[in-house]
Amino acid sequence: MIEIDGSFGEGGGQILRTSLTLSVITGKPFRIFNIRANRPNPGLQRQHLWAVKAMKMISNAETKGDEVGSKELIFVPHEIKGNTNIDIDVGTAGSVTLIIQTVLPAIINKNVRIRIKGGTDVPKSPTIDYIRLVYLEILRKIGIEAKLNLIKRGHYPEGGGEVIIENVNGNPSAFSLLELGKLTIIKGISHVSSLPAHIAERQMNSAREILSKLGVPIEIQTDVRQGEVSKGSGIALAAIGEKSIIGADSLGERGKRAEIVGEEAARILIDNLNTKASVDIHMSDMLMIFASLYGGEYIGAELTSHAYTNMEIIKKFLDIKIDVSGKRPFRFKAKIF
């Protein structure tokens, strides 16, 4: 059984999520201890438990220690169950997108349909529009297709969002994403839920003003939804090059003007573009598991503590070599074979 110290590296939930994904894919059981030991609320929290429960349902796994506050978990997966529907409710504003990242690599070509309820646009995780505009589009470039249906948005703290992920199929193989290529267009989605529509317009216009100096077409849509459980706003942007995509997002909050939200996302996007990387900070982390499974190389905008921790966890499950050139927290090249 693979032993994992949950306090290693950044010491957060990413260690657990990566372990769950690779355990289900490889069939290797693991024991993780010191879960989130150095965090303000140590041990498993509700949203971490739903990642465990989701992967448990997918693989008919045996578990021990899967309860709120537990600092140790044993996870023994069995064969992945295909042709099935799974419902996951992470509660209030638990992150839907972190669940998507955990389950998606394990359900490729398995005909699994997953309905996830919780927070679609919440702090400390990619927004659902980032997932749609950037994450899924980059996966398409490496041979993985997925259908994501956004039914309801959920913001912190009430949540109430709902998405369905299905038709995750493909024939992924070794890939090389070493440059963005010529920038062709910037796409985006500016949204509001149960708030005045002009907020989405102001976010969009603010971002557009800053991005106009890049000299490429800008297509930002607005998504205005009234009657949602939670109130909130945000914007996600995708700079689409001939070979890859760079993304960024920003969320509104009480007291934060809509213009600041749009400006923030635009400046983050430009900062990532200026690194000359092939993928942004979010994808620098998220692409690593796919490069590890299929072989791949890419240039990430920043070698974060998440990415570094991911490398070490991945090597516990897979017999691979990870060659990284670059120093934290700067641009880096990852080659995995």
From Swiss-Prot:
GO terms for cellular component: cytoplasm. Gene3D superfamilies: RNA 3'-terminal phosphate cyclase domain (3.65.10.20), RNA 3'-terminal phosphate cyclase, insert domain (3.30.360.20). It is found in: Cytoplasm. Keywords: ATP-binding, Cytoplasm, Ligase, Nucleotide-binding. Pfam families: RTC (PF01137), RTC_insert (PF05189). PROSITE patterns: RTC. It is an enzyme of class 6 (ligase). ATP binds at Q101, H282, M283, S284, D285. Coiled coil: none annotated. The active site is at H306. One of its GO terms (biological process) is RNA processing. Its main location: cytoplasm. Catalyzes the conversion of 3'-phosphate to a 2',3'-cyclic phosphodiester at the end of RNA. The mechanism of action of the enzyme occurs in 3 steps: (A) adenylation of the enzyme by ATP; (B) transfer of adenylate to an RNA-N3'P to produce RNA-N3'PP5'A; (C) and attack of the adjacent 2'-hydroxyl on the 3'-phosphorus in the diester linkage to produce the cyclic end product. The biological role of this enzyme is unknown but it is likely to function in some aspects of cellular RNA processing. PANTHER family: RNA 3' TERMINAL PHOSPHATE CYCLASE, RNA 3'-TERMINAL PHOSPHATE CYCLASE. Belongs to the RNA 3'-terminal cyclase family. Type 1 subfamily. This is RNA 3'-terminal phosphate cyclase. The gene is rtcA.
